[in-house]
Amino acid sequence: MCDTLVATPDYTKSRTMILAKNSDREPNEAQSVVRYPRTRQKQKGLKATFIQIPQVKETYEVILSKPFQMWGAEMGVNEHGVAIGNEAVFTKITPPKKNDGLTGMDMLRLALERSKSATAALECITELLAEFGQDACGGYENKDMFYFNSYIIADAKEAWGLETVDRHWVAEKVKGF
């Protein structure tokens, strides 16, 4: 399993927010570190990993660490200092396995491209979850790697833990570590 951690300013010597994440993807799956600049979008839609969704008029600059073949990302930060890491969540609820939803990594990238704060990113992910769901294979060679997602979302002032299953979610503001 991947791990993401956050320490809020009250718990760090430097009095700054710290978010850290590792990746445990498949051995033959390379990670790409990429930067996408702020862009005024001309197209009305975008193709995420598996599905087409509406595009917003402007996307914020992002730096992402992502599996090379995926549209979305495991972790990243945007020009407003919003940082997000995501994890696979395996539950007793089985995804339909139809590839007709977003990946958790798609939602992470979309939230960074569209949000000026951690709270706005939380709202973006939960709205995407409600509208498009998360039924999409997250594996590279393993084409049966369907899972739900959890996230740690932070900016300089606040951090959130977000757990999801299917289209359901629960969030809690992080205070401390």
Where are the regions that the model predicts?
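Second-shell loop/turn segments in exported
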Residues: 96, 107-114
